[in-house]
Amino acid sequence: MAMTILASILLAASAQALPPATALPPPVTDAATVLAPINAVFAAFEAGDAPAVLRHVYPEGRVTATGTRASGSGLRHQSWTQFAERLKPGDGFQERISDPAIEIDGDVAMVWAPFVVRVGGKVSNCGYDHFDLVRDNGTWKIMNLTFSSRTAGCPAQ
């Protein structure tokens, strides 16, 4: 009896709680295919090519930006068409993301990444991009983009 109790105590003492489960990183090929429309949209931003942006997004999607504005609220919503209409060729706009976190579940994906925007080679603003994407007929497209934006504390300022 004493041996059974001792064995039970030792077994309980040696048991450890498992760490929380974390998702496995997506296979490299899946990550690359999810990032492809994002990279294409950034290239279209740089070229000021609104039609190219619209080829990689769902028209019913939205762009939502947060950040402090002089006028008060920093929350802005636009359709992809409204957002793309603001692009101008040759304005020197360049956006880069780094260290994207990519989550994929079937035909839905999410990309979260810090970004820096340069205009004419100078840092303009930075923040975080959150893209949600949907795959239809084997093609990933961006449904929505939500991003934060600040002008201070940006890398390389």
What are these regions (language model features)?
Residues M110, C126-G153:
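Short beta-strand edge/turn micro-motifs at domain boundaries
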Residues A2-S14:
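Bacterial N-terminal signal peptides
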Residues V57, F115-V117, T146-S148:
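Short beta-strand segments enriched in hydrophobic/aromatic residues
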Residues N39-A43, R55-A70:
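Short, solvent-exposed secondary-structure junction/capping segments
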Residues G48, Y58, I97, G106-V108, ...:
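Extracytoplasmic
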Residues L18, G74-S124:
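Surface-exposed, charged secondary-structure patches
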Residues A52, R62-T64, M110, K141:
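General beta-strand recognition
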Residues Q16-R55:
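Short, low-complexity N-terminal intrinsically disordered segments enriched in polar/charged residues
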